Amino acid sequence: MTQPASVRWQLWIVAFGFFMQTLDTTIVNTALPSMAASLNESPLHMHSVIVSYVLTVAVMLPASGWLADRIGVKNIFFAAILLFTLGSLLCARSETLDELLISRVIQGIGGAMMVPVGRLTVMKIVPRDQYMAAMTFVTLPGQIGPLLGPALGGFLVEYASWHWIFLINLPVGIIGALATWFLMPNYTMQTQRFDISGFVWLAVGMATLTLALDGNRSLGIPPIAIFALIAIGLIALLSYWLHARRNERALFNLRLFDTHTFSIGLTGGLLARIGSGMLPFMTPLFLQLGMGFSPFHAGLMMVPMVLGSMGIKRVVVQIVNRFGYRRVLVASTLLLALVTALFALVALMQWIWMIPVVLFFLGTVNAIRFSTMNTLTLKDLPDPLASGGNSLLSMTMQLSTSLGVSIAGILLGIFSQPHIAAESGATHTVFLYTYLSMVVIIALPALIFNRVPPDTLKQSTLARKS
C-alpha cells in the first residue's frame, strides 16, 4: 500500500481509534472483582459496568455514519475521541457504581462513533482499489487490543489500581484528538433526512427492555416499574415496525427481511451472540473468584482464547467452502456448548491445567462461528440494501452482547449466596450451575441455523464478503 505521508498519518489516527475501542472492550472484564471491592459492591453484580457501555454503543451506532456525512468525519472523529477520553477520566474518578455507569455511557457514545466513522474515513481518503489493504492496516491494532487487554488490565489492577485501566486512555486520547484536529481533512457528503423517529423508537425499545431484564436484581427497580419498562419497550418496537412499514427511508428498511439468509443470520446471530457474550464476562470472574487466580494471572490465562481466535481466521473460508454454511454453523454452535460445559467440569474437578486448552478451543470455535454468521447474514442482500443490512448487523451484535452479559449476571445472582469468598465451595457451585445454564442457551441457535438453505457458490460468496 503506497500512500502520501499525509494519508499514512490519517490511517494511523484511525488505527489508534480502533485500538482504543477494542482495548476497552477486554481490559475492563479482568478488573471487575477489584472494582467491586473498591466500590463496596458484589463482584457478581458488576455486569452493569459492561452492559452500560455496550448498550450505549448499540443505541448510538445507527446515527454515527449520518453524523459523519453531515458534520464531517474530522469533526465527529475528534468529538468521538474527546468523549471517549473524557468518559475514561470520569470512570477513573468514580467513587460509586452509579457514577461509574454514567461515565461508561459517556465513554460508550464516543466508542460508538470511533469505529464506523473510522471505516468511513478510510473509504474517503484511499482509492477504492487500495481500500482492503488500508482496512487491514487500520484494523491490525484492533486485533492487538483484545490480545493485550486482559493481561494489561490484570497487570494494572494487581500492581497499581483498577483506575489505571481508564487512565491509560488519557495520553492516547489526547494525542489522537490533537492529531485528528491538525492532520485529518473534514470530508462531508450530501445526506438525506435522518430518520429521527425510527432512531428514537429503536433506542427506547432497546434501552427499556435491557433495563427491565435485570433492573430488579441489579438496580432494585420495583416489579411494577419493571412491567412498565417492558410495556414501553414493546410499544416502542411495535411503533418502529409500523413506522418502517410505511417509510421507505426508515432507519432500517423492512425489505431486508425478505432475504431469507439475512433473516436467519440476524435472528440466529442475535441468539448466538447472547450466548457468546456471556463468556468474556464470565471467564475472568470464574478464574478470580472460582479458581482464586490473581488479576494478572487471570488476564494471562485469557491469551490462549485470543490466539485461538486469531489463528483460525486464516482457514475459515476453506472450512465453509468444504462443509457449507449450515453444517459449519450447527457444528460450531454445538461445539461451543460442549466447550462451555468443560468449564463446568473444570469448576467441579478443579482441573487448572485444563483451563488454557479450554480457552484456546473457545476462541477457535467462536471465531469460526462469528465469521460464518456475519458472511451468511450479508451475502445475499441486494446492493441497495447492503449498507443498511450491515448497520443493522453491527447494532444487533452490540445489543446481543449487552443482553448476554445481563443474562449471565442474572444467572450468577440467582445461584449465588449473599456473601461469597474466593475458592469457597459455594462459589464453585455458583459457577457450576451458571455454566450449565449457559450450555443450554448457547446450544439453542443450532435449531435456527439448521434452517439455513443448501449452499451454492460457497467459495465465491464467502471470499467476496468476508
Curated annotation (Swiss-Prot):
Give the record's keywords alphabetically. Answer: Cell inner membrane, Cell membrane, Membrane, Transmembrane, Transmembrane helix, Transport
Q: A Gene Ontology MF term for this entry? A: transmembrane transporter activity
Give the matching InterPro entries. Answer: EmrB-like (IPR004638), MFS (IPR011701), MFS_dom (IPR020846), MFS_trans_sf (IPR036259), Multi-R_MdtD (IPR023721)
For the keyword Transport, the answer is yes
GO cellular component labels? plasma membrane
Main localization (coarse): membrane
User: What residues form the membrane-spanning segments?
Assistant: 11-31, 48-68, 71-91, 105-125, 137-157, 164-184, 194-214, 218-238, 262-282, 292-312, 328-347, 351-370, 402-422, 429-449
Q: How does it sit in the membrane?
A: Multi-pass membrane protein
Q: Spell out the subcellular localization from the entry.
A: Cell inner membrane
Q: Does the keyword Heme apply?
A: no
HAMAP family in the record: MFS_MdtD
Q: Which family does it belong to?
A: Belongs to the major facilitator superfamily. TCR/Tet family.
PANTHER family, per the entry: BLR6921 PROTEIN, MAJOR FACILITATOR SUPERFAMILY MULTIDRUG TRANSPORTER MFSC
What's this protein's name?
A: Putative multidrug resistance protein MdtD
List the lineage, top down: Bacteria, Pseudomonadati, Pseudomonadota, Gammaproteobacteria, Enterobacterales
Which gene name does the record give? mdtD
